[in-house]
A protein has these predicted regions:
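The feature marks the mature, well-folded catalytic cores of soluble enzymes
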Residues: 1-291
Length: 291
């Protein structure tokens, strides 16, 4: 099979830094339990590897993270995820004398700082994101004047709640380009003075752009990544828009890929979310090229 590789692929720099910090936490605290508050990155395969190394996962899908944080023994080692977290988590960790390592992505940090800046300047903030995502929760928690816009329900946003004639608009770092465009257009129509910032990370933008520009003659698209990964699922949505004639598969790893019947296809586009490891990417690429 002919394979076209969409660049960039595999881990983004934020994910690499998160894993390096996790290893540092283990190395600097021998014999101590290290707790991951929520998935360090949104990829089950990567989290399983960390659990094999002795990390304890406090899963946001199974229990409220603030409640989970309360249950961690005082003096333990805590690793915050790459997706950001509310300030109240820092305060609780301090009262419990936890040894904290913060893997929050630098781009997410900058966005959180920008939101705080606008609030301090007396502005209201509209934040576009995925409901239930850790980054969205962290962003909205900064202040009461941060208004959440659900990426799946942009048209249902309560504009009447915005009193500021020049609010700031930011978005989750992993949102889709079309969602940002639609939200921006709607906001400009309703609130002409809105200050729009496309706060997606560069890795997200480049992956989405590369997929949109990929050869249209491809008859199958394989997107590597977890169903829990927002940036992966945005690639899936974009693939459906940009290549409507192609068959599209979203798989986590080689094991899942081998279960797909790829015999009818001859030209594949291969893309990946930012939490897919280089090893998984290379395994899948080699397999596709062997068909």
């Amino acid at each position: 099979m002919k394979v076209y590789c969409c660049e960039p692929h595999s881990y983004c720099s934020g994910v690499v830094k998160a894993f390096l910090l996790a290893k540092k936490a283990k190395r600097e605290n021998p014999g101590k339990d290290v707790y991951l508050l929520g998935s360090l990155v949104h990829n089950e395969e990567a989290i399983k590897e960390l659990q094999k190394e002795g990390f304890f996962l406090l899963d946001e899908r199974k229990s409220d993270l603030f409640s989970s944080l309360k249950q961690i023994p005082d003096g333990s080692v805590l690793l915050f995820s790459a997706h950001g977290h509310p300030k109240s988590f820092d305060e609780l960790a301090k009262t419990k004398n936890l040894i904290v390592y913060d893997a929050t992505c630098e781009k997410v940090k900058k966005n959180l700082e920008a939101i705080a800046y606008f609030l301090h300047a007396g502005r209201e903030v509209i934040f576009l994101g995925e409901k239930g995502h850790q980054e969205a929760a962290a962003s909205v928690s900064i202040g009461e004047k941060v208004h959440f816009m659900d990426g799946k329900r942009i048209n249902e946003f309560p504009y009447e709640e915005i009193k500021d004639k020049a609010p700031a608009f930011l978005c989750q770092t992993t949102m889709g380009d079309e969602e940002v465009r639609l939200a921006s257009k709607s906001l400009q129509e309703k609130i002409p003075g809105v200050y729009i910032i496309d706060s997606r990370c560069e890795s997200t933008k480049k992956r989405q752009f590369a997929l949109r520009l990929a050869p249209k003659e491809a008859d199958v698209i394989v997107i590597l990544g977890s169903i829990s990964s927002n940036n992966t699922m945005k690639l899936l949505s974009i693939a459906k828009e940009s290549h409507p004639e192609a068959r599209i598969f979203r798989v986590l790893d080689l094991e899942e890929l081998k279960k797909k019947d790829l015999r009818p296809y001859s030209y594949c586009l291969l893309s990946s979310g930012a939490s897919t490891s280089p090893r998984v990417y290379q395994e899948c690429l080699s397999y596709l090229e062997s068909l």
